[in-house]
C-alpha cells in the first residue's frame, strides 16, 4: 500500500511538473508561432529574358550594349561599309550619343532622337560650313519617336506625346513642350515609339506588347493608333502588332507599311520579322497567336489558324530587328529606287551568329508584292557589330541619312553615278 505521505509527494510532483510545463509552454508556443524569416528576394528577370533557355548557348544571350561613349569621327567604320556602284557613304555627324530617330525641319535642321542611353533630342545645324550638335531637350524617358510638321517638333515617350512649337526659331532657347496626348500606357517593354503624320493629317503612334509573349488587352496594347493633331479622335488602325518601330505611307496608294519585330526564344531561326501592309482599318496581324504569317504560337495559338490574320507583305529574317523605314521619293538616286523602301535592320542579339546590321531596299510592284535586296552592308565583323543602323531619312536634296546608335553617328549616302 502507498502511504499518505507518499501520496502527497506524488501529487506535489505532478503539480510541480505541470506548473513547469505551463510556465515553459508560452515560450514554446511563441517560438512555434513566429513566422520563419523570408528568404532573400530574387531579382526579377528583365522582360527580354523571360522565356530564355536556362542552359546552352541561349542562356548566354542578352541585348548588345551600344558603345558607352560615341565613337570619334576618325574611328567610324566608313571604310568597311559597302554600297552599290555609284553610291558613296560619308560622315554627316559624329558624337551624337545614342542617335536613333531622324527628321528634317523646314529650314534644313536635322532632328535626332535617342533611346536608352541619352534621353535627349538633338538638333544638327550647319554653321559656317560646320555641323553643330545642339541638345534641345534632355532627361526624357525613352524619347525615340519624333516628327516634324508645320514648324513644330513632336516627341513621343512611352507615356505621352508633346509638341515643341516654332522650334527652328528657338534652338538656343527651346520652348516649353505642350502635351497633346497622354493616353498611352507608359510601359517600358516595347513602350518606345515611332510616330509619323499620315496623308490624312493624323498622327500615327504604336503601342507595343508589354512583354515578349503574352495575351495583352487588345484595346490597350499590340496596336497602331491614330489621333488628330490636338490629341482627340483616337482610332485603332491595326491590331496584333507586337513591336513596330518604323512605318511609312506608300507615296502612290497612301497605304501604311510597318515593320514588326516578332517574339523571342522559340528558336534561332524562327520566327521571321515582318514588313506589313494595312489595306483596311482595324486589320489584325496575328500577335500573339500567329508569327510570320505561318507559325502558330505554341503557348497562345491553340485553337487559332494563321489564316485568320493578315499575312506579312515581306519576311525579312529571323530576329533581324527591323527599325526605321522610309519610302524613297527623292531625285538623286537611280529610277529603280523611286518609291522603294529603305529599311534598317538593327541586327539580332538573340542569335549565336550575328547578321544584318544593314540597310536594305524593298521594291513593291503594283500588286503589292515585295522583294528585298542589300543596300548598305559591312557592319558585322568577326561575329561582332561594328555599327547598327537605326533609322533612315530622305533629305530634301535626295540623299539618304542613316543613324547608327551603336557608334553615336549619322551617315549620308549620296549617288553620283561615278
Predicted segments with their positions:
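Beta-propeller domain segments
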Residues: 35-84, 192, 209-212, 227-232, ...
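Surface loop/turn motifs at the tips and blade-to-blade linkers of beta-strand repeat domains
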Residues: 92-96, 135-139, 180-187, 236-240, ...
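Structural WD40 beta-propeller signal
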Residues: 95, 105, 149, 198, ...
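Beta-rich catalytic cores
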Residues: 98, 117, 132, 139-142, ...
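Hydrophobic core register within WD40 beta-propeller blades
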Residues: 102, 146, 195, 244-247, ...
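Conserved beta-propeller blade signature
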Residues: 109-113, 152-155, 202-206, 255-259, ...
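Asp-box/WD-like beta-propeller blade repeats and closely related beta-sheet repeat scaffolds
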Residues: 142, 159-198, 206
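Blade-level signature of beta-propeller repeat domains, shared across WD40, Kelch, NHL, RCC1
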Residues: 393-418
Amino acid at each position: 500500500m502507498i502511504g499518505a505521505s507518499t501520496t502527497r509527494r506524488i501529487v506535489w510532483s505532478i503539480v510541480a511538473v505541470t506548473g513547469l510545463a505551463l510556465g515553459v509552454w508560452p515560450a514554446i508556443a511563441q517560438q512555434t508561432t513566429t513566422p520563419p524569416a523570408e528568404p532573400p528576394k530574387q531579382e526579377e528577370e528583365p522582360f527580354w529574358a523571360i522565356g530564355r533557355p536556362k542552359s546552352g548557348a541561349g542562356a548566354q544571350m542578352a541585348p548588345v550594349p551600344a558603345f558607352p561613349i560615341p565613337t570619334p569621327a576618325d574611328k567610324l567604320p566608313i571604310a568597311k561599309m559597302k554600297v552599290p556602284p555609284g553610291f558613296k557613304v560619308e560622315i554627316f555627324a559624329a558624337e551624337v550619343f545614342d542617335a536613333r530617330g531622324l527628321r528634317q525641319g523646314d529650314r534644313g535642321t536635322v532632328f535626332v532622337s535617342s533611346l536608352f542611353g541619352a534621353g535627349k533630342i538633338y538638333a544638327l545645324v550647319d554653321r559656317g560650313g560646320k555641323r553643330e550638335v545642339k541638345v534641345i531637350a534632355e532627361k526624357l524617358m525613352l524619347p525615340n519617336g519624333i516628327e516634324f510638321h508645320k514648324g513644330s517638333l513632336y516627341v513621343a515617350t512611352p507615356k505621352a506625346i508633346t509638341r515643341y512649337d516654332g522650334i527652328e526659331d528657338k534652338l538656343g532657347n527651346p520652348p516649353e513642350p505642350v502635351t497633346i496626348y497622354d493616353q498611352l500606357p507608359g510601359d517600358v517593354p516595347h513602350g518606345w515609339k515611332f510616330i509619323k503624320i499620315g496623308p490624312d493629317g493624323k498622327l500615327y503612334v504604336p503601342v507595343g506588347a508589354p512583354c515578349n509573349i503574352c495575351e495583352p488587352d487588345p484595346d490597350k496594347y499590340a496596336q497602331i493608333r491614330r489621333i488628330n493633331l490636338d490629341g482627340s479622335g483616337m482610332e485603332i488602325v491595326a491590331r496584333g502588332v507586337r513591336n513596330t518601330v518604323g512605318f511609312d505611307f506608300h507615296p502612290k496608294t497612301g497605304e501604311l507599311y510597318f515593320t514588326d519585330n516578332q517574339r523571342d526564344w522559340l528558336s534561332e531561326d524562327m520566327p521571321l520579322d515582318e514588313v506589313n501592309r494595312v489595306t483596311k482599318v482595324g486589320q489584325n496581324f496575328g500577335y500573339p497567336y500567329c508569327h510570320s504569317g505561318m507559325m502558330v504560337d505554341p503557348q497562345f495559338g491553340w485553337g487559332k489558324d494563321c489564316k485568320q490574320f493578315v499575312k506579312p507583305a515581306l519576311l525579312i529574317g529571323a530576329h533581324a530587328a527591323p527599325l526605321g523605314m522610309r519610302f524613297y521619293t527623292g531625285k538623286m538616286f537611280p529610277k529603280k529606287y523611286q518609291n522603294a523602301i529603305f529599311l534598317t535592320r538593327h541586327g539580332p542579339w538573340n542569335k549565336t551568329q550575328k547578321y544584318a546590321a544593314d540597310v536594305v531596299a524593298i521594291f513593291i510592284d503594283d500588286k503589292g508584292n515585295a522583294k528585298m535586296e542589300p543596300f548598305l552592308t559591312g557592319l558585322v565583323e568577326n561575329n561582332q557589330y561594328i555599327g547598327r543602323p537605326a533609322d533612315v531619312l530622305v533629305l530634301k536634296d535626295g540623299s539618304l541619312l542613316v543613324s547608327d546608335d551603336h557608334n553615336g553617328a549619322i551617315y549620308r549616302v549620296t549617288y553620283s553615278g561615278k
